[in-house]
């Protein structure tokens, strides 16, 4: 039986300690499930780097899952290059911009087989994480009736696929017929999150940003843009009263514990033997509640990293 490893690759940050917290949390959750011989993390802006991470792995069979929201510069160019995947070609993913699942390559310098997976943010199961995030912020496991949901992301300016991912999940959740209204909103194009109250008739609006970690966008820009607070440093109420609506602002979806499930599902889709880990993690994270409380003191991430932008959701 060949050993199998899961490697989670994420953006990280030199300046914002919150950037990598979800990556470590989800890795711990998956380790506890015990289905991979090894669970490792690699970062663009922290150690171990993408370039070095495969050297920290003993297993021959490696499942690499990007903790990114969308397909783009990082998932299509940076990560395959840094992992030195032999013969990497975007065609291998055969994707329309949101449909990449996995493709298998050799990483010759470390003599490992790498199953390179699509990002977590485009997987169908991410819709469930957005819903779970809404449950967490409202404290209501049955949330939906009489409540609207806004899924927020970057617009197309930096990466067309980023907007596609936001729309994909808004459409999927809308089709669940669980919430009164569901809309995709954007930071830099119409329909803009600044005008959130104009897009809903429902009084209660849950707002979930499709970002993998909390950073300046989720903790500064969006709360101020929506009018939750004049100054993010002073914090905001949950829910906050804005123009006759109550806004329940959830912070980055990727801080939700259930995100670990999507990482496992990506690897399973690529052929990993995950036993009953998916059910186990779903059960455990339901009882664990959220590990991503909404607070306004997470500090600024001045490391704007324009490229990472849309894709990491930051």
Where are these regions (language model features)?
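Extended amphipathic ligand-handling, pore-lining, and cofactor/metal-binding catalytic surfaces
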Residues: 1-314
């Amino acid at each position: 039986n060949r050993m199998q490893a899961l490697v989670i690759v994420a953006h990280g940050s030199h300046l914002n300690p919150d950037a990598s917290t979800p990556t470590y949390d989800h890795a711990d959750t998956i380790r506890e499930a015990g289905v991979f011989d090894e669970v490792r993390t690699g970062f663009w802006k922290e150690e171990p780097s993408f370039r070095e991470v495969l050297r920290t792995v003993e297993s021959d069979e490696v499942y690499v899952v990007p903790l990114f929201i969308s397909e783009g510069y990082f998932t299509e160019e940076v990560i395959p290059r840094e992992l030195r995947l032999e013969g990497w070609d975007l065609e291998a993913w055969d994707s329309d911009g949101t449909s990449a699942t996995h493709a298998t390559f050799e990483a010759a310098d470390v003599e490992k087989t790498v199953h390179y997976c699509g990002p977590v943010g485009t997987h169908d199961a991410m819709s469930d994480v957005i819903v779970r995030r809404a449950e967490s912020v409202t404290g209501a496991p049955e949330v939906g009736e009489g409540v609207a949901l806004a899924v927020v992301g970057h617009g197309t300016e930096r990466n067309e696929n980023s907007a596609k991912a936001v729309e994909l999940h808004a459409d999927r959740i809308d089709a669940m017929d669980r919430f009164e209204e569901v809309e995709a909103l954007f930071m830099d194009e119409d329909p803009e999150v600044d005008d959130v109250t104009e897009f809903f008739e429902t009084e209660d609006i849950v707002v979930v940003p499709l970002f993998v970690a909390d950073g300046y966008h989720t903790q500064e820009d969006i709360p101020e843009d929506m009018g939750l607070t004049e100054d993010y440093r002073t914090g905001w109420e949950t829910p906050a009263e804005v123009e006759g609506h109550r806004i329940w602002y959830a912070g980055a979806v990727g801080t939700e514990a259930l995100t670990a499930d999507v990482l496992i599902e990506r690897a399973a889709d690529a052929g990993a033997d995950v036993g009953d880990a998916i059910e186990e993690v779903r059960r455990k994270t339901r009882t664990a509640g959220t590990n991503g409380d909404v607070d306004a003191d997470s500090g600024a991430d001045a490391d704007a990293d324009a490229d990472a932008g849309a894709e990491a959701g930051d």
